[in-house]
């Protein structure tokens, strides 16, 4: 499972020109699922994300987590995080989980994140054509891969 994490001043996601999820200050998570992902991958990512110290303390150092800062989280499914661009000019999506499995794992991820934060996590609409708007804060952008924990 992969997550592209961005610290934001605000973010929203629209489907058919209707806002379906939005947050103020917090984290925008673009989430990709591969077939081998399990509950262990979800648990590792959720623990890592809620405890990452990416928000500034009183001295301006990145020393506070989204939990400590009271920030919000918006999660958007994105199978393109598993694109392969090795051959030719058209990306291949063969490493991404099939839609049914990806939806299940994404929903499990969102439920686990909501439980860890003790509040709902807004999302986009799985499989829909979405427009994501965000105001990067920093910018702070991190790449997390449960198969390559660094």
Swiss-Prot record:
InterPro entries recorded: Daa-tRNA_deacyls_DTD, DTD-like_sf
Listed GO MF terms: D-tyrosyl-tRNA(Tyr) deacylase activity; Gly-tRNA(Ala) deacylase activity; Ser(Gly)-tRNA(Ala) hydrolase activity; tRNA binding
A biological process from GO: D-amino acid catabolic process
UniProt catalytic activity: glycyl-tRNA(Ala) + H2O = tRNA(Ala) + glycine + H(+); a D-aminoacyl-tRNA + H2O = a tRNA + a D-alpha-amino acid + H(+)
SUPFAM superfamilies on file: DTD-like
Pfam families per record: Tyr_Deacylase
Enzyme Commission number(s) from the entry: 3.1.1.96
GO cellular component, one term: cytoplasm
Gene3D superfamilies the UniProt entry points to: D-tyrosyl-tRNA(Tyr) deacylase
Motif mapping: Gly-cisPro motif, important for rejection of L-amino acids: 138-139
Keywords annotated in UniProt: Cytoplasm, Hydrolase, RNA-binding, tRNA-binding
Cellular compartment(s): Cytoplasm
Function: An aminoacyl-tRNA editing enzyme that deacylates mischarged D-aminoacyl-tRNAs. Also deacylates mischarged glycyl-tRNA(Ala), protecting cells against glycine mischarging by AlaRS. Acts via tRNA-based rather than protein-based catalysis; rejects L-amino acids rather than detecting D-amino acids in the active site. By recycling D-aminoacyl-tRNA to D-amino acids and free tRNA molecules, this enzyme counteracts the toxicity associated with the formation of D-aminoacyl-tRNA entities in vivo and helps enforce protein L-homochirality.
Protein family membership: Belongs to the DTD family.
PANTHER family listed in its UniProt record: D-AMINOACYL-TRNA DEACYLASE 1, D-TYROSYL-TRNA TYR DEACYLASE
Subunit structure of this chain's protein: Homodimer.
Name of the protein: D-aminoacyl-tRNA deacylase
């Amino acid at each position: 499972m992969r997550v592209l994490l961005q610290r934001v001043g605000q973010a929203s996601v629209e489907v058919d020109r209707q806002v379906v999820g939005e947050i103020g200050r917090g984290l925008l998570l673009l989430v990709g699922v591969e077939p081998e992902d399990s509950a262990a991958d979800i648990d590792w990512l959720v623990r890592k994300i809620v405890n990452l110290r990416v928000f500034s303390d009183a001295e301006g150092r990145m020393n506070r987590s989204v939990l400590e800062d009271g920030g919000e989280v918006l999660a958007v499914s994105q199978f393109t995080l598993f694109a392969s661009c090795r051959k030719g000019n058209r990306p291949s999506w063969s490493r991404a989980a099939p839609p049914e499995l990806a939806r299940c794992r994404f929903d499990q991820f969102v439920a686990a994140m909501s439980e860890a934060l003790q509040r709902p996590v807004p999302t986009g609409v799985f499989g829909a054509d979405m427009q994501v708007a965000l105001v990067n804060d920093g910018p702070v952008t991190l790449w997390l891969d449960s198969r390559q924990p660094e």
